[in-house]
Amino acid sequence: MIIRNTDGRQMLRWMEDLWDYPRSITGHGTRSTLEYLKNINPDLNIHSFKSGTRVFDWDIPDEWNIYDAYIEHESGQKFAEFTKNNLHVLGYSIPC
């Protein structure tokens, strides 16, 4: 994607807009990010494939969406809260 006449401030606004999208390799955050980028560059072609589809040596995984996650101390204090920083959770984590 080549976008001409774009300064650093505009790119920073895009990054700020996209920060909260919970992106992984699948899921609503990834689709929302791609749609956002398509609004910037209408020439972007977006393709989707069903989970389980074989692509070369890789099977497309099940969709993964996250809404909340955290580590909680026995006192009830929460740490590494996803709602405060979406980098606290690794994609495809599973609840314990």
Say what each PLM segment does.
Residues 1-96:
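N-terminal hydrophobic/helix-forming segments and targeting peptides
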